A protein has these predicted regions:
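Short, well-ordered beta-strand elements within core beta-sheets of diverse protein domains
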Residues: 31-35, 49-56, 142, 252-255, ...
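Rossmann-like NAD(P) dinucleotide-binding subdomain of oxidoreductase/dehydrogenase enzymes
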Residues: 118-262, 316, 387
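Conserved C-terminal structural/oligomerization subdomain of aldehyde/semialdehyde dehydrogenase
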Residues: 25-34, 215, 351, 358-491
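Residue-level signal for inorganic ion chemistry
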Residues: 29, 62, 84, 106, ...
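N-terminal Rossmann-like NAD(P)+-binding subdomain of aldehyde/semialdehyde dehydrogenases
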Residues: 1-129
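A short hydrophobic/small-residue beta-strand
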Residues: 166-168, 345, 427
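Structural signal for hydrophobic packing residues in well-ordered secondary-structure cores
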Residues: 51, 55, 70-77, 81, ...
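ALDH superfamily catalytic-core signature
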Residues: 217, 225-368, 430, 478-479, ...
Length: 491
């Protein structure tokens, strides 16, 4: 399948037209893709027209269509992974895992729909029969992120389609080519073009889509700031569903781990996979004051060996560039801010080529920094915090407005029980990284990390609404109290 994305020779220097969106390869700076900006009212109208017929089909019909979609993605796996690698800069090996996740999401969503939104019939009081079934909302808008431009929006779109909704999907303006390719896969599988619409554009088109009266809800993955803006906007439309999957300032507590090499490996995986551009990436490493130096030495040795490079290099790098120069600039500014506040670099964050968004992994001790910013540093930066005891470690883990992921490495079962009971997060792990959440479980956070609409296995919950019905074969009714006897005469 051939989309509009091509390898183009020209650099990113040309100025796009006012009505055009251009995507660039972050590892080279060259133009990758371009298209005209879309029209949100037009796309919503098309989805509204197509929705009733799609909703009228049986679940089995829609499930079969999604299974065909999975087969299309399998067939296009190599080209899809290459496109993701080019547009995001992530290594090809990682792009391949994303394509595999797109495929796996179908069977997981089918299972989730059956488990979370089944038809149920029950007996109520006095022999009454009760049925619980679910209906689709209608037309759902999906706003996708750039870090997993296929997997994360697909995690909204597939369960929405199974439930009988139509979708208008606006990919991130930084990864539109991947979004277009994903939509083409739905269409090639025989899902009507009106049922899955692609809206090309940037923030203006996203705001326009969110404001359309013709949508029945919006499913968003992105920053807390954008999520809060959507939350305020949708406060005036409580009849519309809003699911927010936001970021995190995630703690990784390593407490007297017996296997230092494994603990260091988990720390590196948690903090630096995808160049730190994961909402579940570890941002804060919390360790005991009296027993941390051997661990830090082990982490430094891994960081010294870490390869940062182009997505198609052979051998493959551990991580590629950030999504663009602006993102790299922002992470560098956040790093410098920590240093200005008294942070002590252990492994310095560096930018080998100032014109490109490649960053080396940074590790900085911020124990003595006052007023540490409670923000998501969306890049390869890990902040070390030394504490006196395990209670202080838990308090530090909770020292954030976010609440997405947290992990404890080491400790005892009793300590993990205490950690689990007292840490406020939607994902809490033991001896596992903060990232890599399983798709057959709910995924979401509390605080500024979401609005209590977890995705993954629980996405079925926000893609359909329950309808309770009391039912009988024929009407039988009587009024037992409060009526005069018809045979009695009034005085």
């Amino acid at each position: 399948m051939q989309g509009q994305a091509e390898q183009k020779a020209e650099p990113a220097a040309r100025t796009p037209a006012a009505d055009e969106l251009v995507s660039y390869d972050p590892s080279t700076g060259k133009e990758l893709w371009s298209a005209k900006l879309g029209d949100a009212p037009k796309e919503v109208a098309a989805a509204r027209t197509a929705w009733p017929e799609w909703a009228a089909h049986s679940n089995a019909y829609r499930i079969e269509a999604l299974r065909r979609f999975a087969n299309v993605v399998r067939k296009e796996e190599a080209g899809f992974a290459e496109l993701i690698a080019r547009e995001t800069g992530k290594p090809l090996w990682e792009a391949k895992t994303e394509v595999a996740s797109v495929v796996n999401k179908v069977d997981i969503s089918i299972e989730a729909y059956a488990e979370r939104t089944p038809q149920r019939r029950m007996e109520a009081a006095l022999g009454n029969k009760v049925a619980v079934r679910h209906k689709p909302h209608g037309v759902l808008a999906v706003l996708g992120p750039y870090n997993f431009p296929a997997h994360l929006p697909n995690g909204h779109i597939v369960p929405a389609l199974i439930a009988g909704n139509a979708v208008v999907f606006k990919p991130s303006e930084k990864t539109p080519a991947t979004g277009e390719f994903l939509v083409q896969c739905y269409h090639e599988a025989g899902i009507p073009e009106g049922v899955v619409r692609l809206l090309v554009g940037g923030p203006d088109q996203g705001r326009s889509l969110a404001s359309q009266s013709g949508i029945d809800g919006l499913l968003f993955t992105g920053s807390a700031r954008a999520g809060m803006a959507l939350h305020k906007q949708f406060a005036e439309t409580p009849q519309k569903i809003l699911a927010l999957e936001l970021g995190g300032n995630n703690p990784l507590v390593i407490w007297h781990a017996k296997d230092l090499d494994s603990a260091a490996t988990i720390a590196v995986q948690s903090a630096y996979l995808s160049a730190g551009q994961r909402c579940t990436a570890a941002r804060r490493l919390i360790v005991p004051e009296d027993d941390h130096e051997p661990l830090i030495t082990a982490i430094r040795k891994l960081l010294d060996r870490m390869v940062v490079g182009q997505p198609f290099d052979d051998p493959q790098p551990f991580m590629g560039p950030l999504i663009d120069a602006a993102a790299a600039d922002h992470v560098q500014e956040q790093w410098l801010n920590l240093m200005m506040k008294g942070g002590k670099p252990i492994c310095r964050l560096e930018r080998p080529d100032g014109q490109k968004p490649f960053l080396t992994p940074g590790l900085i001790d911020v124990t003595d920094v006052r007023d540490r910013p409670d923000e998501e540093i969306f890049g390869p930066v890990l902040q070390l915090i030394r504490v006196k005891d395990f209670d202080a470690a838990i308090a530090e883990a909770n020292n954030t407005r976010f609440g997405l992921a947290a992990s404890l490495i080491g400790g005892s079962p009793e300590m993990y029980d205490k950690f689990w009971a007292n840490v406020r997060a939607g994902v809490i792990n033991w001896n596992k990284p903060t990232n890599g959440a399983p798709s057959n479980a709910p995924f979401g956070g509390v605080g500024l990390s979401g609005n209590h609409r977890p995705s993954a296995f629980y996405a079925a919950d926000y893609c359909a609404y329950p309808v309770t019905s009391s039912e009988a074969d024929r009407a039988r009714a009587s009024i037992g109290e409060g009526l005069r006897d018809p045979n009695m005469q009034e005085d």
